[in-house]
């Protein structure tokens, strides 16, 4: 069984993707990185292909159309399940999620079924405003209730 898969979705993340991949690989963990790109017109997938020559742990799925974050995450989850990864961690490609927390999540998961990071807990950073803030805040409360999490 493969152990760790890091998943991210991209659309026009050319300026961030190399930084993200380097930060993840600098953790020196045995992991794979799957990136679902929605045919970014800025050259994101071309940059990922270049990075694949440097890092053998990168998996790129380039979709023909922009079909959104939710379907990208579904694809990542299906890939993880099909390829029997033990752990899956999703990060935003825009660097709003700190890859250094991957080690914290992996340490915590040993005692739980699920670990969920949130910008609303102590130490979290929230820069959302207006409707995005409300949707995110209440969406997280609903997820916590469904998962019966603390």
Where are these regions (language model features)?
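Short, conserved active-site loop motifs that form the nucleotide-linked donor/cofactor pocket
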Residues: 4, 31, 57-59
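Short, acidic, metal-binding catalytic loop of nucleotide-sugar glycosyltransferases
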Residues: 22-31
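Residue-level signature of catalytic and energy-coupling elements of molecular machines
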Residues: 24, 76, 94
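Short beta-strand/loop segment that forms part of the nucleotide-sugar
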Residues: 31-40, 61-62, 91
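Acceptor/aglycone-binding surface of glycosyltransferases and processive sugar-polymer synthases
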Residues: 61-82, 87, 99-150
């Amino acid at each position: 069984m493969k152990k760790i898969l890091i998943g991210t979705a991209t659309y026009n993340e050319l300026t961030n993707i190399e930084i993200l991949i380097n930060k993840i690989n600098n953790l020196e963990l045995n992991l794979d990185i799957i990136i679902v790109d929605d045919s970014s017109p800025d050259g994101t997938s071309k940059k990922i292909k270049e990075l694949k020559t440097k890092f053998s742990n990168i998996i790129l799925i380039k979709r023909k159309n922009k079909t959104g974050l939710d379907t990208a995450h579904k694809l990542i989850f299906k890939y993880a399940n099909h390829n029997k990864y033990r752990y899956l961690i999703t990060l935003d490609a825009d660097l709003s999620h700190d890859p250094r927390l991957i080690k914290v999540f992996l340490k915590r998961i040993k005692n739980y079924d699920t670990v969920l990071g949130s910008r609303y807990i102590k130490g979290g950073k929230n820069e959302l405003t207006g409707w995005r803030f409300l949707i995110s805040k209440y969406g997280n409360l609903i997820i916590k209730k469904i998962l019966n999490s603390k």
